[in-house]
Amino acid sequence: MTNIRKTHPLLKIVNNAFIDLPAPSNISSWWNFGSLLGICLILQILTGLFLAMHYTADTTTAFSSVTHICRDVNYGWIIRYMHANGASMFFICLFMHVGRGLYYGSYTYTETWNIGVILLFATMATAFMGYVLPWGQMSFWGATVITNLLSAIPYIGTNLVEWIWGGFSVDKATLTRFFAFHFIFPFIIAALAMVHLLFLHETGSNNPTGISSDADKIPFHPYYTIKDILGALLLVLALMTLVLFSPDLLGDPDNYTPANPLNTPPHIKPEWYFLFAYAILRSIPNKLGGVLALVLSILILILMPLLHTSKQRSMMFRPISQCLFWILVADLLTLTWIGGQPVEHPYIIIGQLASIMYFLLILVLMPVASTIENNLLKW
């Protein structure tokens, strides 16, 4: 008799996705981040659910309710810090996952890639709204500054911002709606992740060589289930080390001061995972120009399949492109550093150069390098 996992309508789906799925035999640890992102999402939904049981989305009590969670709720402190630092781990995994896609040419699976970009946008929006909820100084001013960027949109800008705020400033209405959206978004992300997986399984996974692996497939279980478990253990180890030894390492001290609309912090900056985009935004002196550059810095990922001029899919055998890729990584690290610095002399010009370099690398240098490599193959 056929095994129930192959016949049962529900188990059949799980079986085809996680057990009998034919996978390439040579995918490296860079392919672990998909499953790690799934684990991060589940962890964030669970810790977030327990936080929501004790949190109040009201300007007068939000800050106090977070303090109450940390001081009075059983293990509230660990739930709160797992949720806050879980977001950091989530973004580390996201950046690695996207970087892997860029390096190995996984963006040629256009449907999977485009849904991935939408997932990235949705996750960034969710993280931003979550950062507003503790209602500290950086929460309030971060919300004010970032939502205000929409006022740069011609004609409808001001109306749009006031519509999002639910008033003439960031206030109770804003906090309440941000909490509502922050709660619902992870479930939308989970649904999109399933669609992401659905499209991936139409084609099967890419592999480091970028060459079809149809001739050499192995079952997902036990090979990649055990590999994913190892990845998960390392992720949890990293997360719990952060949570238990230095939970506030990646946070901003200003967020331990309750929100005060009358007092602006000296340096308004977002969480570390948005600093690269924030640096690009700040490097353009024009408001609308900055906002466009900010959006394009992420949206540019959608153009990747169109910018692919190489005859080879992966960068594994393309040394010039490899070199440019790692320069791009260094450039993003530079932008992240600049985003956290005050707007002063050396930092302004470094930020502007790094921003120009970012777009130049993706739009010009990498496609040109690919064309050069194509011609070198003829020799």
UniProtKB/Swiss-Prot annotation:
UniProt binding sites for a ubiquinone: H201
Tree of life domain: Eukaryota
Cofactor: heme b
Cofactor binding mode and count: Binds 2 heme b groups non-covalently.
GO molecular function: metal ion binding; ubiquinol-cytochrome-c reductase activity
CDD domains hit by this protein: cytochrome_b_C, Cytochrome_b_N
Subcellular localization: Mitochondrion inner membrane
GO biological process: mitochondrial electron transport, ubiquinol to cytochrome c
Primary localization: mitochondrion
GO cellular component, one term: respiratory chain complex III
Residues engaged in binding heme b b566: H97, H196
Annotated membrane topology: Multi-pass membrane protein
Pfam entry (one): Cytochrome_B
Residues passing through the membrane, by range: 33-53, 77-98, 113-133, 178-198, 226-246, 288-308, 320-340, 347-367
Residues reported in the UniProt entry to bind heme b b562: H83, H182
Keywords: Electron transport, Heme, Iron, Membrane, Metal-binding, Mitochondrion, Mitochondrion inner membrane, Respiratory chain, Transmembrane, Transmembrane helix, Transport, Ubiquinone
Note: Heme 1 (or BL or b562) is low-potential and absorbs at about 562 nm, and heme 2 (or BH or b566) is high-potential and absorbs at about 566 nm.
General function of this protein: Component of the ubiquinol-cytochrome c reductase complex (complex III or cytochrome b-c1 complex) that is part of the mitochondrial respiratory chain. The b-c1 complex mediates electron transfer from ubiquinol to cytochrome c. Contributes to the generation of a proton gradient across the mitochondrial membrane that is then used for ATP synthesis.
Family to which this protein belongs: Belongs to the cytochrome b family.
Assembly behavior: The cytochrome bc1 complex contains 11 subunits: 3 respiratory subunits (MT-CYB, CYC1 and UQCRFS1), 2 core proteins (UQCRC1 and UQCRC2) and 6 low-molecular weight proteins (UQCRH/QCR6, UQCRB/QCR7, UQCRQ/QCR8, UQCR10/QCR9, UQCR11/QCR10 and a cleavage product of UQCRFS1). This cytochrome bc1 complex then forms a dimer.
Stated name of the protein: Cytochrome b
